[in-house]
Design a protein with these regions (language model features):
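…and closely analogous acidic/polar surface helices at protein-protein or active-site interfaces
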Residues: 2-37, 53-58
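Extracytoplasmic/secreted cell-surface and envelope-processing proteins
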Residues: 3-5, 48-50, 108-112, 138-142, ...
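Short, charged loop segments at secondary-structure junctions
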Residues: 4-9, 45-78, 177-180
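Soluble periplasmic/extracytoplasmic beta-strand elements of cell-envelope proteins
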Residues: 20, 36-42, 60-62, 98-102, ...
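Sec-exported extracytoplasmic/periplasmic mature domains
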Residues: 26-34, 44, 64, 68, ...
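VWA/integrin I-like adhesion module and closely mimicked acidic/polar interface patches used
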Residues: 73-76, 98, 105-176, 180
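Juxtamembrane amphipathic/hinge helix adjacent to a transmembrane helix
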Residues: 184, 188-220
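C-terminal signal-anchor/stop-transfer transmembrane helix together with its immediate cytosolic
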Residues: 207-247
Length: 247
C-alpha cells in the first residue's frame, strides 16, 4: 500500500514533524497492550531509546524525551539501524516480529552495504519491516541547531531561525525493503495519514493472545510466545543533528 497527502506548512500548526510522530506513536503504543515494544532512533549509528519492554509507562517516558541533538552525528545509515533491530528480534520466539522504520531522509554518505542486504536477512528470520516515508515534499522548513548551546538558533528577540532546505527521501529503497520482507511501504503527508498508517499496521499485525482471567500484568513477561515483538525505528529524529525539520 502507498498513501500520500500534503504536509505543507501551516501558520496554525507550529508542531514539528517530531512532535506529530511522537503523538501518533504514543497512541500506537497504547493500543499494543500485550506486545513488547522497543524504540530505536538513528543517524549514522543507532541510538537505543528503549529496549523491548511491556512497561508502556517506561516506554512512553523515553519517547517523550526524544529530541534533536542527542548525538552530534550527521548523516544517515539505514542498514545499521536495521541490523540493530534485527539482532534484537532474531533470537526471540513470537508469532509476530516486526520493525517499523520511519524516516524523512536517505543514506548519506553512501553505506558500505546496501540496506537490502539486511532486508534479505530479516526475510529469512521472518521479520517484517514496514517502512514509512515522512513528508510529501523534499523541501521543508528547518530550525538551525546550535551544537554549542544544545538548542535551536534564535535571533536577538528570541525568535527561532528558520530556513528552507532540501532533504530527499529515498522512497525506492524503502519500498524495496518492505517488499522483500512481505510488509508494506507507506507515505505519510500529514498527521491523520500517519495515524491511519499505524492503524493499518496495527490491524495487519494483530496477534492472537490467550490469557487466563486472573493473569497479572507482570506475568506477561513469562509468556513471550503469547506476545508480539515490535521495534519502532525513527530515522529522521537524529538524522541531521544540525537541522531540525518541521512540516
Amino acid at each position: 500500500s502507498m498513501l500520500a497527502l500534503d504536509m505543507s506548512p501551516s501558520p496554525n500548526n507550529p508542531n514539528t514533524r517530531l512532535d506529530v510522530v511522537k503523538e501518533v506513536i504514543k497512541e500506537f503504543i497504547n493500543k499494543r497492550k500485550y506486545d513488547r515494544i522497543g524504540l530505536v532512533a538513528f543517524a549514522v549509528d543507532p541510538y537505543l531509546v528503549s529496549a523491548l519492554t511491556l512497561d508502556k509507562e517506561y516506554l512512553q517516558s523515553n519517547l517523550a524525551r526524544l529530541k534533536v541533538g542527542l548525538t552530534e552525528q550527521t548523516g544517515t545509515n539505514i542498514g545499521s539501524v536495521l541490523a540493530e533491530g534485527i539482532n534484537r528480534l532474531r533470537p526471540l520466539e513470537s508469532k509476530s516480529k516486526i520493525l517499523i522504520l520511519l524516516t524523512d531522509g536517505k543514506d548519506e554518505p553512501p553505506p558500505k552495504h546496501s540496506p537490502l542486504v539486511y532486508a534479505e536477512g530479516a526475510q529469512k528470520d521472518k521479520i517484517k519491516i514496514y517502512t514509512i516515508a515522512i513528508g510529501a515534499s523534499t523541501r521543508t522548513r528547518t530550525y538551525l541547531y546550535d551544537p554549542n548551546a544544545r538548542d535551536i538558533m534564535r535571533y536577538a528577540n528570541g525568535t527561532p531561525v528558520v530556513e528552507v532546505a532540501e532533504y530527499p527521501v529515498d522512497k525506492e529503497i524503502l519500498q524495496e525493503i518492505a517488499q522483500r520482507t512481505d510488509a508494506n511501504f507507506f507515505e505519510a503527508g500529514d498527521k491523520s495519514t500517519l495515524r491511519s498508517i499505524y492503524d493499518e499496521i496495527d490491524q495487519l499485525e494483530k496477534t492472537d493472545i490467550e490469557l487466563e482471567v486472573n493473569a497479572l500484568y507482570e506475568d506477561l513477561y513469562q509468556w513471550p510466545l503469547a506476545c508480539g515483538f515490535i521495534i519502532l525505528i525513527l530515522g529522521f529524529i537524529l538524522e541531521h543533528s544540525i537541522l531540525l525539520r518541521i512540516p
